[in-house]
């Protein structure tokens, strides 16, 4: 199978992998001579060939034997290993962002500003103002998931967005930004790019998502559809003025408690089995209870995470714990799983913890991370045995 593609545009973000193998794929970009062109092919060792003729500069790549895209679950969000072409005729990434910044500034509205002041008029502090505005937008506006490129990077007047109760991700981000600033919270819109791209060579098409940075009581908060701080440095965050933003990586923190009672009626033949319930958040919500034993591509977790669940078990009178109370620890270079069982008077305290401090794993590392996840999700590891 052969595929040839010629793109004449000023802003390209194209993945060059299909669901079936490609024998040969030729990609070419043509621009008038003298036009600035920044381009890069990622996920492939193929080098660019540049030619000029009749006042036209052409840059092309010929890729051969591209494998079919993987159907494995939990692939990297940025697909770093897939052939990926990025090109732009903007003078720089900063210049591209400046065009977007200009359009956002033209979309400011009076009604949305006064409405933000009305909503937060009785708020006691800055954090409360942020929560009120964020919750209003989340609960009362719908997001139309239309890529920015398909709208021509246009932004409706923000007052129109507020009145219509819907908007594109770009419009929703700008509405949040405008309302926060109107409430006295210094804020700005940020662009988020895949971390492996050279953002200075990117146009607007390579933007993965948008976020809003709000300075609350002197500390920066990042408001986005998914937490930016849990990605482990896999993304690059840039302000619309072109300044790179360094975001401290912090794992998701989950700490929950459960109470479990065991009655004598549950015993059979002198023994009772107690299965501690899984929680509905964290790793148990990721759908990883049945991972393949082997993997040929990168494996990516939804986020870094630290999770702790404490169970207080109250057995019936006369029941004795038969499960070993020895601490269990399974440790790997990037995380660990622990379990402690401690009798406390008439109750038994069970504490399970898991830490995953890395988000992306090679096929060689996959077995280790799979063993930690399996240790956590396997219901057999949440069983206590009692005798009566």
Regions found by a protein language model. Name each.
Residues 1-4, 8-388:
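A sensor for short, sequence-defined functional sites
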């Amino acid at each position: 199978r052969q595929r040839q593609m010629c793109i004449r545009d000023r802003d390209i973000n194209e993945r060059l992998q299909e669901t079936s193998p490609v024998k040969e794929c030729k990609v070419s970009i043509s621009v008038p001579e003298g036009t600035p062109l920044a381009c890069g092919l990622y996920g492939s060792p193929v080098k660019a060939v540049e030619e000029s003729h009749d006042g036209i500069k052409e840059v092309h790549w010929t890729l051969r034997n591209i494998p079919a895209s993987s159907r494995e679950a939990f692939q990297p969000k940025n697909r770093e290993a897939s052939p990926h072409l990025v090109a732009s005729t903007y003078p720089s990434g900063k210049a591209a962002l400046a065009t977007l910044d200009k359009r956002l500034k033209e979309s400011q509205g009076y009604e949305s500003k006064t409405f933000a002041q009305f909503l937060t008029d009785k708020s006691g502090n800055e954090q409360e103002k942020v929560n009120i505005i964020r919750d209003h937008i989340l609960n009362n506006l719908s997001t139309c998931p239309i890529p920015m490129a398909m709208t021509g990077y246009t932004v409706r007047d923000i007052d129109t967005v507020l009145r219509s109760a819907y908007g594109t991700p770009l419009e929703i981000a700008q509405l949040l930004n405008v309302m926060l600033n109107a409430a006295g919270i210094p804020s700005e819109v940020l662009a988020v790019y895949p971390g492996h791209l050279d953002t200075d060579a990117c146009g607007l098409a390579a933007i993965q998502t948008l976020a809003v940075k709000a300075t609350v009581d002197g500390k920066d908060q990042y408001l986005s559809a998914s937490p930016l701080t849990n990605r482990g440095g896999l993304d690059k965050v840039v302000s619309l003025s072109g300044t790179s933003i360094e975001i401290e990586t912090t794992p998701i923190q989950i700490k929950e408690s459960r109470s479990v009672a065991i009655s004598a009626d549950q015993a059979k033949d002198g023994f009772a089995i107690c299965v501690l319930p899984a929680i509905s958040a964290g790793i148990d919500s990721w759908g990883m209870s049945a991972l393949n034993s082997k993997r040929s591509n990168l494996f990516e977790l939804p986020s870094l995470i630290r999770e702790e669940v404490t169970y207080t078990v109250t057995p019936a009178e006369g029941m004795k714990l038969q499960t070993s109370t020895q601490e269990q620890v399974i440790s790997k270079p990037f995380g660990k799983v622990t379990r402690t069982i401690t009798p406390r008077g008439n109750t038994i305290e069970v504490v399970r913890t898991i830490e995953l401090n890395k988000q992306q794993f090679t096929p060689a590392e996959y077995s280790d991370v799979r063993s930690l996840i399996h240790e956590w999700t396997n219901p057999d590891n949440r069983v206590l045995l009692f005798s009566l």
